[in-house]
Regions:
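Long, structured ligand/cofactor-binding scaffold of large enzymes
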Residues: 64-66
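Bacterial N-terminal signal peptides that target proteins for export
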Residues: 2-11
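Bacterial N-terminal signal peptides
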Residues: 10-20
Length: 308
């Protein structure tokens, strides 16, 4: 049996608990920016539910969903979509990921929605003419993109384990993209460092994240009208809009125009997969984590076994 004291020590356990939010819970901690000179630890306690993410605005979206009666999966999916707006460095519709879910009845499951290589991918596509690795091809070119899994994964989780409709949990992200939000330290720092190196070669992205010839700065307002439209279409028409509809057509056209490999067929064929988590015993606690293709879950269990 998993001991409650252990689950409370794991940051993500609150999102996997399936509990509803209690009005008696403590207010969210002040936002802490990463990528700066100093971080401050803000302990927070709650009796029924808790939300944690890399971005305070996205975290608040999840808290609001819990307050409105949503469960942990509803909140997690809403936060994921919000991060596609507020944390474009990593959380976005064009990526993928993994999700562990522990339901109220005690079952634990894993959802794999990592990106997949396009059908036309080859083992040497990131090599230059001399056969040497070319980091630009593997990191910043259109070849670096895999078939996205985010939208499919969120939909699978929400349909099977959530309680709210898709348009409800996408709505906060849509509003953030449409109305804009204030750029924080983390995004400003990343735009200054990486945006100056990468974005000048991608005019569509530069048009969003640059203003008056330079990357957006802390305090600027970031509005993403095209992303808002995409989110609205997904909310109204479901994941098929992304994988088989207008958005899929635009992705395929962009790839073909710029040397990428993702096709409409790749997008239409993508499926998120539910898997059985790996598990291990550590000092009497049952630890669950992601199975392959994630490597981290296996390593965690191995390391804990070594420590024991």
């Amino acid at each position: 049996m998993i001991k409650p004291t252990f689950l409370r020590r794991v940051a993500i356990a609150a999102l996997l608990s399936g509990s509803c939010f209690s009005a008696a819970a403590a207010p969210p901690a002040p936002p802490v920016s990463y990528g700066v000179e100093e971080d401050v630890f803000h302990p927070v306690r709650a009796k029924q539910g808790m939300v944690a993410s890399v971005d305070a605005t996205a975290t608040q979206v999840g808290v609001d969903i819990l307050k409105e009666g949503g469960n942990a999966v509803d909140a997690a999916v809403a936060v994921g979509y919000a991060l596609a707006v507020t944390h474009p460095q990593a959380g976005n519709l064009g990526g993928g990921g993994f999700m562990l879910i522990r339901s109220k009845n005690g079952n634990t499951t894993a959802i794999d929605f990592r990106e997949m290589a396009p059908a036309k991918a080859t083992r040497d596509m990131f090599l230059d003419d001399q056969g040497n690795p070319d980091s630009k091809k593997s990191l910043t070119s259109h070849l670096a993109s895999g078939t996205p899994g985010t939208v499919a994964g969120f939909s699978l989780a929400l349909d099977k384990y959530g309680t709210m409709p898709l348009n409800k949990v996408v709505q906060p992200a849509f509003k953030l993209a449409r109305d804009g939000f204030i750029v924080n330290d983390a995004l400003a720092d990343d735009l200054k460092t990486y945006g100056s190196e990468v974005l000048p070669n991608h005019e569509n992205s530069k048009a969003i994240f640059w203003k008056e010839g330079e990357p957006l700065k802390k305090g600027d307002t970031l509005v993403q009208a095209n992303l808002a439209k995409s989110l609205e279409m997904i909310a109204e028409n479901g994941p098929d809009e992304f994988y088989k509809g207008t958005i899929a057509e635009q992705i395929a056209q962009e790839m073909q125009k710029n040397g990428g490999l993702i096709t409409k067929e790749d997008l239409a064929a993508y499926k998120a997969v539910e898997r059985t988590p790996i598990s291990g015993d550590y000092r009497g606690y049952q630890v669950y984590s992601m199975p392959p293709p994630s490597s981290g879950g296996i390593h965690i269990v191995q390391i804990l076994n070594i420590l024991e």
